[in-house]
């Protein structure tokens, strides 16, 4: 009975959520697009000409937002191939419905074959921005969930260390709780500028927080 009450309450909140309605109206696949939009408007992360990698991209709302943002710059050059001023590469283990001008690679970004596809798309350039809305399946066991969350952040940090340009940025989702301070410390060891962001589009009941790292530190 309690589970049914929870599901009913969640469905009620979801249906009446203004960001859900806005996403449906504006064609975004998930309300998460507005979390990235708010952070981007505050921190000016997405700019014309960038190479952007979206880790754990499915269903694709973050890639959609990035694509729409880069398309505005491309309007000045209607003949530009691809229709956007920049490159967006989305990666996920799960399939993702195509998005115009977004390159999608399905697979584990730790595998050599996936990295080879990424490097072919990037060419001689380095990545300007890595974004990750990845989240594990939470079990409700605090210690286990904290370890899963930290593991995903570690993967994003390692990917950024290998592929991000020196003045690039990494934005990842994490959750307040056990292990949060360790994740922040790892960001501080890797980036010169670190900030936490809690966009209004993030539900009040949620402990999710986004950590932003800018400007890689040189390896010791």
Swiss-Prot record:
It holds the Pfam family FtsJ. It is found in: Cytoplasm. The active site is at residue 173. Keywords: Cytoplasm, Methyltransferase, rRNA processing, S-adenosyl-L-methionine, Transferase. It catalyses: uridine(2552) in 23S rRNA + S-adenosyl-L-methionine = 2'-O-methyluridine(2552) in 23S rRNA + S-adenosyl-L-homocysteine + H(+). S-adenosyl-L-methionine binds at residues 60, 62, 92, 108, 133. The keyword S-adenosyl-L-methionine applies. Its EC number is 2.1.1.166. One of its GO terms (cellular component) is cytoplasm. Specifically methylates the uridine in position 2552 of 23S rRNA at the 2'-O position of the ribose in the fully assembled 50S ribosomal subunit. Belongs to the class I-like SAM-binding methyltransferase superfamily. RNA methyltransferase RlmE family. This is Ribosomal RNA large subunit methyltransferase E. It comes from Paraburkholderia xenovorans (strain LB400).
């Amino acid at each position: 009975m309690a589970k049914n009450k929870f599901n009913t309450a969640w469905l009620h909140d979801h249906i009446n959520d203004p960001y859900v309605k806005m996403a449906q109206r504006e064609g975004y696949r998930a309300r998460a697009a507005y979390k990235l939009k708010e952070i981007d408007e505050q921190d000016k992360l997405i700019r014309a000409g960038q190479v952007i990698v979206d880790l754990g991209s499915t269903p694709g709302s973050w890639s959609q937002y990035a694509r729409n943002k880069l398309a505005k710059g491309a309007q000045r050059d209607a003949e530009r191939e691809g229709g956007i001023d920049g490159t967006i590469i989305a990666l996920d283990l799960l399939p993702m419905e195509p998005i115009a001008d977004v390159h999608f690679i399905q697979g584990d970004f730790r595998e050599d074959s996936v990295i080879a596809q990424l490097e072919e798309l990037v060419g001689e350039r380095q990545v300007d921005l890595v974004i990750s809305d990845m989240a594990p399946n939470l079990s409700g066991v605090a210690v286990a969930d904290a370890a899963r969350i930290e593991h995903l952040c570690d993967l994003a940090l390692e990917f950024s260390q290998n592929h991000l340009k020196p003045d690039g940025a990494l934005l990842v989702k994490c959750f307040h709780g056990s292990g949060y301070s360790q994740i922040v410390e790892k960001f501080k060891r890797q980036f010169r500028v670190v900030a936490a962001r809690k966009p209004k589009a993030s539900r009040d009941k949620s402990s999710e927080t986004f950590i932003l790292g800018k400007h890689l530190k040189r390896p010791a």
